[in-house]
């Protein structure tokens, strides 16, 4: 069976059960992962980084974790420029530190009206579009890993 393009699929049906909303949201995430997959080479890299991080947390490694980044990431080019610069620093300190770029895609202090970040509104000039925001967020994270080899915290 051929799946319709992502934009043509119907995702949200409003019911009064939280369980249905959770299942629908889960399906959206699975579909986005299928439509925008992480290439096998990046999956391997992510697994290696996750293992290094786990070793620090469990005390198997003497390195320190440093999660570093801006309050909110809402411009893909700027974020990737920042992560590229951080990757250069990472090369200098990788024997003692594991640098994890923070790519936070919400605006944590924005409530009510206003721009809430790329995940809610990928284009600040247009209406909010959560699905497009999830896609933009995934693309930004994949690009950052591809360009730098650094996996991020969100």
Short names for language-model regions:
Residues 1-12:
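Positively charged N-terminal leader segments that act as targeting/secretion signals
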Residues 15-60:
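N- or domain-start disorder-to-order transition segments that initiate the globular core
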Residues 51, 58, 84-95, 142-150:
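Generic secondary-structure signature for well-ordered alpha-helical cores
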Residues 69:
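Conserved, mostly hydrophobic/aromatic
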Residues 42-44, 48-53, 89-100, 137:
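N-terminal beta-rich core of secreted/periplasmic extracellular enzymes
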């Amino acid at each position: 069976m051929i799946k319709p393009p992502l934009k043509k699929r119907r995702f949200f049906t409003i019911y009064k059960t939280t369980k249905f909303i959770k299942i629908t949201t889960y399906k959206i995430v699975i579909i986005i992962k299928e439509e925008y997959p992480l290439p096998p080479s990046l999956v391997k890299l992510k697994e290696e980084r996750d293992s290094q991080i786990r070793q620090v947390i469990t005390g198997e490694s003497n390195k320190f974790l440093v999660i570093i980044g801006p309050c909110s990431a809402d411009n893909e080019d700027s974020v990737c420029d920042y992560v590229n610069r951080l990757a250069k620093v990472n090369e200098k300190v990788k024997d003692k530190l594991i640098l994890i770029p923070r790519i936070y895609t919400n605006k944590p202090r924005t409530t009510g009206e206003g721009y809430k970040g790329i995940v809610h509104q990928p284009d600040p000039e247009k209406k909010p579009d959560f699905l497009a925001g999830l896609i933009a967020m995934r693309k930004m994270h994949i690009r950052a890993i591809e360009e730098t080899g650094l996996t991020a915290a969100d």
